[in-house]
């Protein structure tokens, strides 16, 4: 063991603890498992199931046993090091996996399992903690402490595998179970990958059977006669339950995924597919390259790939080492010819179209049959990128919206796929339709407060530009002429009452407090220069906390602006301040004023206590 330097403890199990170490010769990171019981001879060591199993298994998706060391009657296994396990990968995420990622993970698990079964072993303890990962693009099966040879003689022990992933024949104390128990566990893991919740979270063995019955329904005697024999031998009666369609429990799974899980989670072990048969299921027949070809992937390569500029890939297939954690932030934009669904996104706003994007998606996915997908068709000819790299989900050719109010920005925040976003032309049409309305959201938000939840370091210019749409030009004209700018607190009227002219660009003023921004964007404005630019966006509120006043309906913020058009003009604004909420500045657009026929106040408010009568001052016409 003097050839390795131990660095820290990674975990502690029933039979041994795992340490992280480094080879003194090569500097390679390794995981060293130190067995708890002592071994007094090599023969005793070689008879260990873990040694017998792993000595024979060499596969890209099975953890590699580098060497076995016996020192001072202690036994050490030296394994290749993996960054994390599948449970940690799920736990550390703040949103669900897209189906493309789940498909690749499942493909690798089943590849490794098929290899193990082919060589005459079954694992007996398949669970997320025993699936080691280097991100979602490389998964390996580990911890063969309970592995048995298929040809070894029963009876086997009844306590195998963590309860939540334990097959019903094991729960009913069968002594002749075999490799189908691993397939059951993989089906349970697959459901958990979609929901981040265990499918059968039983608190005891009896409760575990009850949880299975709640989902799959009570088995019929004709469906599983051996199960009824096992139940009667231990005086157990199956609870009477009606089956629940897995689609209702896992709404973000495709129909092929539901079908595969249903087959793997069959009461009768004889009716479950083998791992090899599961790999041939239509769920995996999507025309993408699955599995890990680069099984020598190391952490440096992973980090290097993550830092490379990311291109929009509508068909982001799991080619290794290509599909690194960037695909985590994209929903399933995979080519799925037999489905047009989207994975469950609990925070995703309603999209304009649900059934139209897939055909468009298919059109973009024919070229990526080659190794490097072409993106030339998605780039406008006259687009000039002035803002540089913004993040993994920044769309190319969209930087011509200099006002920073692209109608797709909120979808970027919430993880909408590239292929399902409207084109620039459609976006411009939306803006022409309703220049003061925040698309796809009922929230009252100023147009300047929309943006992507990323570090956008470029200033957003208010100067007129012939390339901008009519809506943007009109908005700029309004902002030049208006004495009220977004974020002004109407209570601070000392300058206005004194007749002083307010500089429309003095944003770093007490009269112009920093806005809290919109709920969808979580942004605040900072001053970048005094030349008339709205400052660069900076993110805040990384925890996802949202002030309660932003959750309310239109007009529930501190002040409400209502358009009261006089004559043909709709440019005059009157403020009505609610009591008790005046500390929140920020304009709120009143949707009723969009229709000029609806006028809330036909009479102008007279000046009171020094407030300026704007109608009298400007005559109702600009």
Curated annotation (Swiss-Prot):
Major subcellular site = nucleus
Q: What positions are modified (Phosphotyrosine)?
A: 159
Spell out the catalytic residues: 125
Gene Ontology molecular function:
ATP binding; metal ion binding; protein kinase activity; protein serine kinase activity; protein serine/threonine kinase activity; transcription coactivator activity
Domain Protein kinase: from-to ranges: 4-284
For the modification Phosphothreonine, the affected residues are: 157
GO CC, one annotated term: ciliary tip
Q: Which Gene3D superfamilies does the entry link to?
A: Phosphorylase Kinase, domain 1, Transferase(Phosphotransferase) domain 1
InterPro entries per record: Kinase-like_dom_sf, MAP_kinase, Prot_kinase_dom, Protein_kinase_ATP_BS, Ser/Thr_kinase_AS
Q: Which ranges are annotated Polar residues under compositional bias?
A: 336-355
Q: Which GO terms describe its biological process?
A: negative regulation of non-motile cilium assembly; non-motile cilium assembly; photoreceptor cell maintenance; protein autophosphorylation; protein phosphorylation
The segment annotated Disordered runs over 301-371
Q: Which CDD domains does the record match to this protein?
A: STKc_MAK_like (cd07830)
What do mutants without this gene show?
Answer: Mice are mostly fertile, develop normally, and exhibit no gross abnormalities and spermatogenesis is intact. However, both sperm motility and litter size is reduced.
Tissue spec = In pre- and postmeiotic male germ cells in testis. In photoreceptor cells of the retina and in the olfactory receptors, and in certain epithelia of the respiratory tract and choroid plexus (brain).
Listed A to Z, the keywords are: ATP-binding, Cell projection, Cilium, Cytoplasm, Cytoskeleton, Kinase, Magnesium, Metal-binding, Nucleotide-binding, Nucleus, Phosphoprotein, Serine/threonine-protein kinase, Transcription, Transcription regulation, Transferase
Could you tell me what reaction this enzyme catalyses? L-seryl-[protein] + ATP = O-phospho-L-seryl-[protein] + ADP + H(+); L-threonyl-[protein] + ATP = O-phospho-L-threonyl-[protein] + ADP + H(+)
According to its UniProt record, the EC number is 2.7.11.1
Listed under subunit, the entry gives: Interacts with AR and CDK20. Found in a complex containing MAK, AR and NCOA3. Interacts with FZR1 (via WD repeats). Interacts with RP1.
Give the PANTHER family listed for this entry: MITOGEN-ACTIVATED PROTEIN KINASE
In the record, the note on similarity to other proteins reads:
Belongs to the protein kinase superfamily. CMGC Ser/Thr protein kinase family. CDC2/CDKX subfamily.
Q: What does this protein do?
A: Essential for the regulation of ciliary length and required for the long-term survival of photoreceptors. Could have an important function in sensory cells and in spermatogenesis. May participate in signaling pathways used in visual and olfactory sensory transduction. Phosphorylates FZR1 in a cell cycle-dependent manner. Plays a role in the transcriptional coactivation of AR.
Kindly provide the name given to this protein in its UniProt entry: Serine/threonine-protein kinase MAK
Supply the source organism for this entry: Mus musculus (Mouse)
